[in-house]
Amino acid sequence: MVPRLKSKYEKEIRPTLQKSLGFQSVMRVPKLEKIVINVGMGEAHTNPKAMEACLVEIGQITGQRPVKTFAKKSIAGFKVREGMVLGCKVTLRGHHMYEFLDRFINVALPRVRDFRGVNPKGFDGRGNYNLSVREQIIFPEIQFDKINTIYGINITFVTNTEVDKEAFELFQAFGMPYRTAGK
């Protein structure tokens, strides 16, 4: 079954963006390529149980098994050695990507405490959007009474466009609730 946001993109969003951005070819229209979910846990090397719980929770949130991330080099000030586990990440593409985006926009973001919209300044100058969530408990897949540690999640939305304005319009069409200037 095709995810709701994917069919909405193909039937409504893509033709609308093609007209509004003035593209001749449908292939020039901005498209979401992948979503990368990353968790960096400072206590991963001192508390292996917290890291294992993080792997399970990110797997529940995304529907895919996360990959552990390791330190590339030693940093004495942070007591980090090369090869230590520092966190985990998941790359979502295809159906999983659209299903995650749908759940994130319509279920998880409204559960954020004092939510006024996501920051529109999270674009990197290359058409990709980055945002951070302070708590993993905003996702409905996480059972609040079973978590030991609360940690933040970094989410990167990668698009095929190089222009931030085009990516902004794409995410707005998906329903991303951006913070307005007055708030």
From Swiss-Prot:
PROSITE patterns per UniProt: RIBOSOMAL_L5
Record key words, sorted: Ribonucleoprotein, Ribosomal protein, RNA-binding, rRNA-binding, tRNA-binding
Entry GO MF terms: rRNA binding; structural constituent of ribosome; tRNA binding
Coiled-coil region(s): none
Pfam families given in the database record: Ribosomal_L5, Ribosomal_L5_C
GO biological process, one term: translation
Gene3D superfamilies assigned to the protein according to its UniProt record, in alphabetical order: 3.30.1440.10
Gene Ontology CC annotations of this record: ribonucleoprotein complex; ribosome
Record's function text: This is one of the proteins that bind and probably mediate the attachment of the 5S RNA into the large ribosomal subunit, where it forms part of the central protuberance. In the 70S ribosome it contacts protein S13 of the 30S subunit (bridge B1b), connecting the 2 subunits; this bridge is implicated in subunit movement. Contacts the P site tRNA; the 5S rRNA and some of its associated proteins might help stabilize positioning of ribosome-bound tRNAs.
Oligomeric form and interacting partners: Part of the 50S ribosomal subunit; part of the 5S rRNA/L5/L18/L25 subcomplex. Contacts the 5S rRNA and the P site tRNA. Forms a bridge to the 30S subunit in the 70S ribosome.
Family label: Belongs to the universal ribosomal protein uL5 family.
The protein's name: Large ribosomal subunit protein uL5
Source organism of the structure: Leptospira biflexa serovar Patoc (strain Patoc 1 / ATCC 23582 / Paris)
Underlying gene: rplE
